């Protein structure tokens, strides 16, 4: 769909950019998700970590805006919107589709502007150079697409649990199809690894994303790499939130101390 100019503020849902925030954590949601899933993080992480939930169009407060089906266009316009906020240390967290978006955004920022995040957290998605573990469904007719969504593990189960959600699901169908198009049509291009630290996080009970899928992220950084596997399925970022936030906080602490030392 054709894109129009959007105010940079529309891309961020109540970002926590206070004076105390020494590092901004831009957080990217999964397919079919929205920035609101990260609001609780703002209360649970220390004030030195400014959680900035990124809101893609076609959902929540941007429901009436056209959604993306081309990742390269999304990345270019997302970079332009976030650039004014990248004047202090920042990090990326992305879950599932969000991990892919944040990875390509980090590469774009490096190539076009010579800037990089201090750290990147890739959660619940196989490394980008690996083939998609599932069969593509974005091109299927609505009924088959919905059937595919029910069998795949990448969409919140709550959408399918009762008939009351059926009307909502029909409304969300174009956005869901667009998100899956982004993921399933992605073509990895070989480049130099990122120069920032990278943490890969997966769920032990995720039927599609294995330890090997997460370990393969190591290829994409020339800096430090660590991997964590948490209990839970694909949506462990909700069920294991406390443990996940502990990993994020402990990882970013070293950057906070360093930044304070500069001042």
UniProtKB/Swiss-Prot annotation:
Coiled-coil blocks: none
GO molecular function: oxidoreductase activity
Task of the protein: In the final step of gramicidin biosynthesis, reduces the pentadecapeptide-aldehyde intermediate, that is released from the terminal module of the non-ribosomal peptide synthetase LgrD, to the final product ethanolamine-containing gramicidin.
Protein name, per record: Linear gramicidin dehydrogenase LgrE
UniProt xrefs under InterPro entries: AB_hydrolase_fold, TEII, Thioesterase
Organism ancestry: Bacteria, Bacillati, Bacillota, Bacilli, Bacillales
Keyword Methyltransferase attached: no
Gene behind this protein: lgrE
EC code: 1.1.-.-
Organism of provenance: Brevibacillus parabrevis
Residue numbers annotated as active site: 96
Domain of life: Bacteria
Annotated GO biological process: antibiotic biosynthetic process; lipid biosynthetic process
Further remark: The reduction is strictly NADPH-dependent.
Entry's family note: Belongs to the thioesterase family.
Enzyme class: oxidoreductase
Swiss-Prot/TrEMBL keywords: Antibiotic biosynthesis, NADP, Oxidoreductase
